[in-house]
Amino acid sequence: MRQDILVPFVTYPDANTDALVDRAIAVATFLGRDIHAVALEVDIPDVSNLVSRLLIGLPDMIRRTEADSRARGAALLGAIEAAATRAGIRFAGESASAEPALFGDRAAELARYHDLSVVGLSASNDSARMVAEGIVFGSGRPALLVPEAAPPGAFDRIAIAWDGSRVAARAVTDAQPFLERAGEIVVLTVTDDKPLADAGLGTRLAAGLAARGLTARAVSALRGNRPIAAALQADAAAHGAGLLVMGGYGHSRLRDFVLGGATEGVLSEPTMSVLLSH
């Protein structure tokens, strides 16, 4: 059975950049997967009244905004289709519309039909973050978060943020296609962030991976006074990893996500590719 990756492009108010195209092609090539891209276009409800129509022309403003969103989506779909063709990757594309506040929900619905989503993040793109949160916590599928502003990293060495938790174990399972292709796996355990059930839990995971024929080693790290997300990403990079695998902590409270510290950090300030799974 062929597997594929979903690449959701946000188009409003800011669009993803062509960097996401390059990252998605690299992931599909590494995993040998097809690409299914979707342009998330804005659908703005017309709540105008007579005064707003006469004074500011609100319906016309809405139509222009939606047209701009569709144009950005078409450009991104065209770019990734052309790149996929050059790389010999099977491609399918579509557009989907949603109200701005529902981009995350729409993306989660779409992601359920694909094996992995590749989501581009940047510090100023709140819609992209909404999509990432929606997919991680609402789709039941893993998401690969790629910072559009950072240089792409190779996946030949992968770090696992390991604390022995359920979500970390889920992330390791979801990352198997990457782990099986990696030259080395670094099991990274931060020992001064929170109580750990077992001082040797990193060594135990590394041994389990090695028993499956993978090259793995366990390392310990100290958070110190750094935010936990910054510590994990920096230490993973220091060990030569181009991908960090970690579990996503969070739950929905009245539609607002309450996130764990590491999860919040990688969504807010990603410095490397992170496979996040809930």
List the model feature ranges, each with a label.
Residues 1-62, 138-141, 154-221:
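Small/aliphatic-rich secondary-structure junction motif
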Residues 17-20, 103, 128, 168-171, ...:
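Amphipathic coiled-coil/heptad-repeat helices and related helical stalk/stem segments
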Residues 21, 26, 30, 105-152, ...:
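Gly/Ser-rich helix-loop-strand patches that form or flank binding pockets
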Residues 36-38, 94, 118, 144, ...:
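Hydrophobic/aromatic beta-strand patches that form the interior of the parallel beta-sheet core
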Residues 42-43, 81-117, 212-244, 250-255, ...:
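Structural beta-alpha unit
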Residues 59-75:
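A short acidic, glycine-rich active-site loop
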Residues 75-83, 204, 208:
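Amphipathic alpha-helical segments that form well-ordered structural scaffolds
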Residues 97-101, 123-125, 165-166:
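Short beta->alpha connector loops
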